[in-house]
Design a protein with these regions (language model features):
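Formylglycine-dependent sulfatase
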Residues: 2, 7, 15-16, 21-188
Length: 188
């Protein structure tokens, strides 16, 4: 008597397995945009009536908008490290803005958000201003790929010699030379 019940239960489980597997692939995309010196009220999706931000507004309307958030630091390098690690930046090795050529950098053994996402099957990418070390694209300090990014396209701090046609972008550890256009369009 128990055998037909177990057989029916196994058939039910086996037939629902493809549905469960297909839903496992329906994870949301995660896009984090970090901008230096951007305040809560600077975006029109948060109420600014002077500055228009239609592309960010569209992302906000189709995704999740956070209304209670804090920066781990008022300057760029530590705020990036705090966001990636979830820790107080000085505990991760970065306590201030990092000038080019400086020895300060995020500790290589930090457990970062990209590492966590990779462990759950996400592909990870970083594009734009890195600024988590002073010796960018040098073996003396860890680089974006060491913190869980499958692909990265970045500068250490600012585009140079200017934001138009910058020459200092690096893709996965290799210099790309001059890139035509404005850096904000190139990294997007």
């Amino acid at each position: 008597m128990l055998y037909p019940f177990i057989k029916a239960l196994l058939i039910l489980i086996a037939s629902s397995l493809p549905l469960a597997l297909s839903r496992a692939d329906e994870r949301p995309n995660i896009i984090i945009i970090l901008c230096d010196d951007l305040g809560y009220g600077d975006l029109s999706c948060y109420g600014n009536t002077v500055i228009r931000t239609p592309n960010i507004d569209q992302l906000a309307s189709e995704g999740i908008r956070f209304t209670s958030f804090y920066s781990s630091s008022p300057v760029c390098s530590p705020s990036r490290v705090g966001l990636m690690t979830g820790r107080t930046p000085d505990r991760a090795g970065v306590y201030d803005w990092i000038p080019r050529g400086n020895r300060m950098h995020m500790s290589k053994n930090e457990f970062t958000m990209p590492v966590m996402l990779k462990k759950t099957g996400y592909a990870t990418c970083m594009s734009g201003k890195w600024h988590c070390n002073g010796l960018f694209n040098q073996i003396n300090q860890p680089q974006p790929g060491d913190f869980g990014f499958d692909h990265w396209f970045a500068t250490q701090n600012n585009a140079a010699p200017s934001h138009k046609d910058p020459e200092n972008f690096v893709r996965n550890g290799k210099s790309v030379g001059m890139s035509k256009g404005f850096c904000c369009q190139i990294v997007a």
